[in-house]
Amino acid sequence: MILFLTNSNPNLDTATNILIDSFTQAFERLNPTKNAQDSLTEMKKRLNDNDLGKSFYEYLLKSERQIIDFDNPNNNLYEMMAELPYKSFRPDITLFINGLPLVNIEVKQPLAGQGIKEERDRHIKRYKNPENKVFYNLAQIWLFSDDLPYDEKNSDQGVFYSASYSPIFQRFVEADKLDITPPPPKK
């Protein structure tokens, strides 16, 4: 279940957009004998590394503390918030897992002309801005959509994604339909 957050003043770490109360609640449920503040401090340190988020990602996966329960996803806390600002920009939708803003979604108006192209250009510009390093090191995936179907002839419409380590847009495309009917038996 995903909770839609409408609180305009969440207990937010403004340097990272981590939801402090949500992180602490989830962390203490997953790690009853560990201190949430220690892990938060370690994550914030790693988010400032110049490694495109690798150190933070490894901490998520390999820490002795369980930040996300990958084996039992129902043990995690899922939340989303619309238009949560970060420094000089505001993603349309932010998805949180255990208080961590790991997914950002930009939704463009269909048939808005250059909506996806303009968003791609803004994304690249933000990515290159050192002020946004922590945010890009934290967000694991970006999604962009103009709610239009994939079209080979128009490469600026459809649904796109970008991983945290690169501002390159990748497209979600429909796979070719394969005929997997076995050949008739040989006589």
Sequence positions of predicted segments:
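An alpha-helical interface "stripe"
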Residues: 1-187
